[in-house]
Amino acid sequence: CIPAANPCRGNARCCGNYVCKNGRCLPRS
């Protein structure tokens, strides 16, 4: 998975409760 605050693309899987938004792994609201 991609660590928080790291760059990501599309539906990349971010670690923990984070989602790929605006090219970054951000917290899911």
From Swiss-Prot:
Ordered alphabetically, the record's keywords are: Calcium channel impairing toxin, Disulfide bond, Ion channel impairing toxin, Knottin, Neurotoxin, Secreted, Toxin, Voltage-gated calcium channel impairing toxin
Principal location class: secreted
Q: Name one GO cellular component term.
A: extracellular region
Single GO term (MF): calcium channel regulator activity
Tissue-specificity statement: Expressed by the venom gland.
Provide the domain comment.
Answer: The presence of a 'disulfide through disulfide knot' structurally defines this protein as a knottin.
Which family would the database say this protein is a member of?
A: Belongs to the venom Ptu1-like knottin family.
**Protein name stated in the entry:** U-reduvitoxin-Pbi1a
